[in-house]
């Protein structure tokens, strides 16, 4: 029986593919090969003695056997055919093997593992029935995770993986958890500086207040809105500067840099303003020192988002996060391979891994008696994403409330956050998503000085 020489290329199980070529075969594979081909039996069959000949003596048999083995060696067994897996059950991309109970590609395997290990809670911005395939799999994390469960991926398999790793000696694990390597220490220091130099802390600001609509809520105070929109534009530019200073961020494609910035900008804006919350006065302070109470924040444009933001700020207080932790959490929010429409999600994931490790070690060294603080802080990303989704909707309604046009950088960065389609095309017919104005390479000192919102 001969074996077909035509095989399908299978990605290496341990490899990380950043580009997935179009499959050169139909989506449905032939049946999985059930077993290996039998080795050749040539030379192993016994030959009956020739009729009429006497039975040879044992010595003669041994001599003949030895001579035969020397003259006619048995050919080697043929190599088994390469194993061919069915396509990924989740997205139909090329599978790298069976992961967590089903045939899956590296991308869906990693997505499922991260989602379970981090207890991620996703939101679908459509009807919870998104099509998940090789092209659309990064567009809706909620529906992708549901598809993983539907095809049979097992939570327990992920947990068992983690339990295997925990079987290492306790002393070695403890040492690894608390030891900051030189590389991670350098990474942590760079991110701390990037955060502090793009976001002054509350104690560095000269706080000032305004009496404008301070005691009653209105739909929109235009004076406060003008001031808030000016400050928000400057904050967005500072977030872009922060991103450019993160190690590895500028090595990503320009398209991926823009995708990540637009997806995480509102997350980081909310996280930053909430670290400047003063519970005694129930106020928040902006980067120029302007301090607004809850009512004024509502009237400045936050509207129905106000109470969500203040609740989140109160939840941050017991965590007592310092600048290093806030900077690392901001970087993790930004550099996230689960964002929609990334060209190189695996590369983004690789950049995020040392950030997670650095935050874990830093938190455990700073709070050795609070081992659960790392997952508590990390889970704040889920809360931020939930608030940001509502924030993007708020930007859309604000367009109808303000008398003039929305400041371009706010509209471009916040309205088109992940899960929201751009509403208005540019003059050349392209959507704002592809506008070069928010390219990280274009937001430097010269472009800031030329921006009409900062002059």
From Swiss-Prot:
Region (Disordered) residue spans: 44-78, 416-455
Polar residues bias locations: 47-66, 424-434
One Gene Ontology biological process: beak morphogenesis
The entry's DNA-binding region: 88-153
Induction of synthesis: By retinoic acid.
GO molecular function annotation: nuclear receptor activity; RNA polymerase II cis-regulatory region sequence-specific DNA binding; zinc ion binding
Region of interest called Modulating, as start-end residue ranges on this chain: 1-87
PANTHER family: NUCLEAR HORMONE RECEPTOR, RETINOIC ACID RECEPTOR BETA
Protein name: Retinoic acid receptor beta
């Amino acid at each position: 029986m001969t074996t077909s020489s035509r095989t399908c290329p299978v990605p290496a199980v341990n490899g990380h593919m950043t580009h997935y070529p179009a499959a050169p075969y139909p989506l449905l594979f032939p049946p999985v090969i059930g077993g290996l081909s039998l080795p050749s039996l040539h030379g192993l069959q016994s030959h009956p003695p020739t009729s009429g000949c006497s039975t040879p003596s044992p010595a003669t048999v041994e001599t003949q056997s030895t001579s035969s083995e020397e003259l006619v060696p048995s050919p080697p067994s043929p190599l088994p055919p390469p194993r061919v897996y069915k396509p990924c059950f989740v997205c139909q991309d090329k599978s790298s093997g069976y992961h967590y109970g089903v045939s899956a590609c590296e991308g869906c395997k990693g997505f499922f593992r991260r989602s379970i290990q981090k207890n991620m809670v996703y939101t679908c911005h459509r009807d919870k029935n998104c099509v998940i395939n090789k092209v659309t799999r990064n567009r809706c994390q909620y529906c992708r995770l549901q598809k993983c469960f539907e095809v049979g991926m097992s939570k327990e398999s992920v947990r068992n993986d983690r339990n295997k790793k925990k079987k290492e000696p306790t002393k070695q694990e403890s040492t690894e958890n608390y030891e900051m390597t030189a590389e991670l220490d350098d990474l942590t220091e760079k991110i701390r500086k990037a955060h502090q130099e793009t976001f002054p802390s509350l104690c560095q600001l000269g706080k000032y207040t305004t009496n404008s609509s301070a005691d009653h809520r209105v739909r929109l105070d235009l004076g406060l809105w003008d001031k808030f929109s000016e400050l928000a534009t400057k904050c967005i530019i500072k977030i872009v500067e922060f991103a450019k200073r993160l190690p590895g961020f500028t090595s990503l494609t320009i398209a991926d840099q823009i995708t990540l910035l637009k997806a995480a900008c509102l997350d980081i804006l909310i996280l930053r303003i909430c670290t400047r919350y003063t519970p005694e006065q129930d106020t928040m302070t902006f980067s120029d020192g302007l301090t607004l109470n809850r009512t004024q924040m509502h009237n400045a444009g936050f509207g129905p988002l106000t109470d969500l933001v203040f609740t989140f700020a109160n939840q941050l207080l017991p965590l007592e996060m310092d600048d290093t932790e806030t900077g690392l959490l901001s970087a993790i929010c930004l550099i996230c391979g689960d964002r929609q429409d990334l060209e190189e999600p695996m590369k983004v994931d690789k950049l995020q891994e040392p950030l997670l490790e650095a935050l874990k070690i830093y938190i455990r060294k700073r709070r050795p008696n609070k081992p659960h603080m790392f997952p508590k802080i990390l889970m704040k990303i889920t809360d931020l994403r939930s608030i940001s989704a509502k924030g993007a909707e708020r930007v859309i309604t604000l367009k109808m409330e303000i008398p003039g046009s929305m400041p371009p950088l706010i509209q471009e960065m916040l309205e088109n956050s992940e899960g929201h389609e751009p509403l208005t095309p540019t003059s050349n017919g392209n959507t704002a998503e592809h506008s070069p104005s928010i390219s990280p390479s274009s937001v430097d000192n010269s472009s800031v000085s030329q921006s009409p919102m900062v002059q």
